């Protein structure tokens, strides 16, 4: 016979009636259930946008379940690998070695070397104080022909600071090299989808002979690197703003944040920002 060993759950703090729920946080931010389903897109979908690259996740089984299923759902299992972290690895204090040797084993077993590896470290690396610089330095020494992109799957950090998604949308552009800008090129950062050909921004830029570079239209690794040639960096997606601004500062480029809007006045204001930045004639509502 089963016997209750704890106290009966008091619904007072465990339940909130709809009429009493307050926006934006109806529940106290304490111990929470982590649902295995978070919506349509996650960091695996986003990382798969990088051409000629693979993703490697170093984490425990429970954390792996969602990302590996995403790769399978995308029919992209050939671009996805993982290194399973077990309890003994944490207790023995050798998580750096497990990460390095695990990634090395994955790459040695591949028939080819990808142009880049999006290497995702996780919460455990934070908990045990792993030396991430040592990990990446050693991997870059072993595989000088591969670009290792520093990515994170650390949802413990979502209560403050940048989310894993924001950090990923910055990291994907870290390989962009310093170069002289092309006066007739504009680069668009941080989006999940390429701008539609009928969009105001793209029609305006095409009208004046500008090349628009976007990650979603890049077919090769070199196409991605060529995004640094843009004289102006744009972002239209909130989660990509941090990454775009960071790369613009690093590469000394002018940048604009033009988020999607359904307000005519705001749209006109954004188009004016764009024309002013490029020195183009102001757009009229009739144009």
Regions found by a protein language model. Name each.
Residues 1-287:
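An N-terminal assembly and electron-transfer interface module characteristic of large anaerobic redox
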